[in-house]
Amino acid sequence: MRKFLCFAAALSVALATFAQSGTNSPYSQYGLGQLSEQSGGFNRGMNGLALGFHEHNQVNHLNPASYSEIDSLTFIFDVGMSGQVTNFKEGGKKLNANNADFEYAVAAFRAFRHLGVSFGILPYTNVGYNYSQAVDLNDGNKTVATNTYSGTGGIHLVYLGAGWQPLRGLSIGANVGYLWGGYTRTVVNSYSDSYANSLVKRYTADVRNYKLDLGLQYTAKLSKKDELTVGLSYSLGHEIGGEPLLEIVSQNTQTGVADTTSSANSGNKLQLEIPHSYGVGFMYNNNNKVKVGVDYNLQQWSKVKHPVSVGGDGTALYQMAEGVFNDRHKITLGTEICPGAESRSFIKRIRYRAGVSYTSPYLKIGNQDGPKEFSASVGFGIPIMNAYNSRSILNISGKWVNLKSGQFITENTFMLNIGLTFNERWFAKWKVE
């Protein structure tokens, strides 16, 4: 009961902190927001490597087929948080911003032989930014026009999944999730001349819908100590609702008179969408001491319809359009080294991790490709308890992320991730003689 209460408390904290934004990036003003990494504490040390990974004492929710490998006597509970420092650079100007976030809370256990179950809560997207641009109109009256951009929100995911091993070496799995959340984005055009009307554009959406993820893993024995795992994943793309709305408010600060126009959409409710996603990964395992893997992920954003504003500043025509995004390609290479998981030496029991990845730009900004993403991470899995009924791991990793485009803002982010995995023996039967 005490463990269930701890997990419930962690979920409550997660729900409360998900109301806050996990990003400061101005790029979160596009699409559904900044896409969350969604990986656990141990994945992050390998820069999110996951599709071919399975472990008896870790929750790998990025491939639900991995749940079938969960130990039969334990309940696994994993929570994580992160802190980040981001440097923004554009046109010779620099700015730093800090952020901290409660990232996820997930759990898993063995339900039946070769059948594992997992559930948890984690972010899907984040929206959080606030910046402004001022321009001198050179109209002879020293009038300055200021555009202020701000946004908050994000979409969150709660899921329940299962992984089953029907044949030796072959596992299949599925996560059924529920997406909820939304965003509020505002663009304010104001002027130093108090007689000029200010113009406010407000974009809102409220999402409530399902999400489906499928996974498969097949492990082939290469020798007594070596094995190779192939992992596949698929996420269903579909409409998720949201009823995105654009409102335009024109207001005179002197008179206080305001005119509000809601978006015209021919009487039909607009629908946000998520893309079909595909992934393939390989993991080579040498005697559980050295693991090396590679993942490739494709998200078909180019086929997703998204609402866009058309017309002049005084109109509010908001309609669905295709080709707003590019397909998103991501390739990740990672490794984990553990000299001796059962060794008496503390240093040998530590898991040493590293990973790098490249992500192609999927955003289109003014008909130009958005930023490319390069990232690298290092991490450690540190055993902090090693009793018979408790084998917990502290997962710590540092990650550098570079978002760069020749035309737009460059972001350099250093992120510190901390995850704590509790691995408790719940289902063992004690025999007294």
Q: What are these model-predicted stretches?
A:
Residues 2-10:
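Sec-dependent signal peptide recognition
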Residues 20-38, 43-44, 114-433:
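Outer-membrane beta-barrel porins/channels
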